[in-house]
Amino acid sequence: AYGTGIPAWRLAFAVLARRMTPDEVYAWLQRLKVQRRDGERIAAAVTVAPRLVERLGGDSLEPADVVAAADPFAPDAPLFAMALEKRPELDDYFTRLRNVRLEVSGSDLAELGLGESPEVGEILAELRRRKLNGQLDGRESELAAARELISAA
């Protein structure tokens, strides 16, 4: 439904393993000779999904907070979290938020005078956070915010 491309068997394994400890999950997947990468995703889904549900169940989060919680473990853990508990935030993540992209890039920041440094990534991350939260609505607003962030640095 969300176009994640996750093989159905991987989610099925996560469901079967949902009551196991992380060590039990890894041992079980090794006995089944599941490829390491798939096994890591299944184990992460089993261990992270309940925490993700708990995190999203607290105070209302901004869209960027939802993305920050879900992205590192996507798509398996957020999808499995939805199977555990229907969360509107995760529905929004899969239908809209995970596809939010900036219209500016590091090259644009260089044209604004920012040299190569870790600051480029930090500014791009802040711009995406603002865009996710609805504070930026296109290339011009992204460039204006980038100028502001560069001058404040």
How should these model regions be labeled?
Residues 1-86:
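Conserved, hydrophobic alpha-helical core segments of structured domains
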Residues 63, 75-153:
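Charged substrate- and nucleic-acid-binding regions of tRNA-handling and nucleotidyl-transfer enzymes
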